[in-house]
Amino acid sequence: MEGRGRALCRPEEEPFADQWNILAAAAGAKPLAFLLGDFNSEADVRGEGYDLILRSGWQDTYRLARQRDDGYTVVQAIDGWRDAPDAAAKKRIDQIWCSQAVPVHSSRVVFGGKQEPRVSDHAGVLIEVER
């Protein structure tokens, strides 16, 4: 990916929409691209970052999955969210996005304290793509 080795987004300088546009442009030049990580944008909150990504034409692999768990990667108050009114609410802010719809067999939270030990304030996400 062009830009490898340099910061594409500087959160302290650019709001989410600008960061997303830079990242999507860099990744979207490929025929098939996956973007994953902590997007700090709740999947069930309308009109914010999650909806911006959807409107950009990217696919949430969690929604594409034939089998999935509840998807919550944050299940308690964490740094950066402690002062929010819903700080203790479960959140799905760690996501895997794909530049086009692909057949996703399953999506599940890993290292979230259920099947594997919790290792961070965020759990990971694992998808299995069908061939």
Model regions and ranges:
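Active-site regions of metal-assisted phosphoester/phosphodiester hydrolases
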Residues: 1-131
